[in-house]
Amino acid sequence: MTTSVPIQPRQGGRGRPIRTSILGTGMSLSVFHEPSIALLPEQFAIHSIFERSDKGRLEALKQAGRLDGVKIVRTFEEVLEDADVELIVVSTPNNTHYGYAKAALEAGKHVLIEKPICPTLVEATELYQLAESKGLILSVYQNRRWDSDFLTLQALLSSGKLGDIIEMTSSFDRYRPLPRTYQSGVNWKETPGASNNAIYNLGSHLIDQAVVLFGEPTKIGARCLDQRGIGLDESFVLDLYYPPAETSSSKTPRIITLRASILSALPHQLRYLVKGSKGSYVKYTLPNSHSALKEINEDNPVTHEGFGVEPEEGWGTAYIAKEEKDGADFTEEKVPASAGDYKGLYLNLFEAIDSADRAKLAVKKEQVLSVLKIIELARKSSDEGKVLSF
């Protein structure tokens, strides 16, 4: 059994920006990590970016002056051996997470890994044991906990307005027919490989949100689907079974359905459908053509004007029964959207590292491991065609 040692106090004292090195130069760097860090200059400073060879991916950031003073390093060893680096952000393909994170921890660096933490529960458990034995912080980039729609749902469920939750559907459906220009291997997320399946990518977010709201399920049933026929399960339907609410007289389990379809040809995709004993909640996404939904890219990162603030026409609707009886009338009310705040994850990470207290982490080890266990069981359930116990 691994002995957990206290978190190492920061050299030079608390309160200084955490010097951070980022591995990977894809969209996550330019759209999520760099913009979030830029909003927290008193908490973080990008020290370096690891790019094996110059492929031009950093050019837009350089021209915008967003990488002034940032080192561009060509070997991972340079990052590991640099005593100035305190935190390493692993923003690379899923199958590389374990190797990079293990080396970073062994070099005495705190680590933040893109979801999923790594492809297997065994590897994830080993990484946490290593971090604890070294007195280091290890966390996972579950930024969608800070999405506007999830924060809104979380507050609504906490209010008790809907009564006991009976069932819920949480969806990340899209319509992306296979382009004629498709070539396997161009985009790693569309390249056949077990850890590239949608259940690891979009699924990690949906499962994490369910674990935050309801904890660990008792049973799991799943169907993982290759809807476009490219040799990769890009879609899934996952049922998580939970005991009924403590205040319910029913013995029927609550079922939380998580789904992601890549061929959902609808202008308004369902995001949430929650049914409770006193009312229900329905939330749709805005159509992709809506002006409020600027495409998130290098020109419009997560800090663009209006990001995280959903217009009223996109708010979800709560339907509350006036009386708990057959055929009751309902009140219909729009639920004001909470503001999204992706930098909140980084701010929380700073608090944990700066205070040398991993208990402050919002993304808990137990939750991360639960998410990965659910993913592994979901794949097994799909392969075997049956519901499995957690």
Regions found by a protein language model. Name each.
Residues 1-17, 50, 87-89, 136, ...:
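C-terminal helix-rich "cap/oligomerization" subdomain common to oxidoreductases
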Residues 2-67:
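N-terminal Rossmann-like dinucleotide-binding module
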Residues 2-16, 201, 207-299, 346-355:
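Contiguous beta-strand/loop segments that form the cofactor/metal-binding neighborhood of enzyme cores
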Residues 126-144, 164-168:
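Rossmann-fold dehydrogenase core element
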Residues 145-229, 385:
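Predominantly a Rossmann-like dinucleotide-binding segment in NAD(P)-dependent oxidoreductases
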Residues 113-114, 138-140, 169, 283:
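Hydrophobic residues in well-ordered beta-strands that form the structural core
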Residues 67-130:
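Beta-loop-alpha module in the N-terminal Rossmann-like domain of NAD(P)-dependent dehydrogenases
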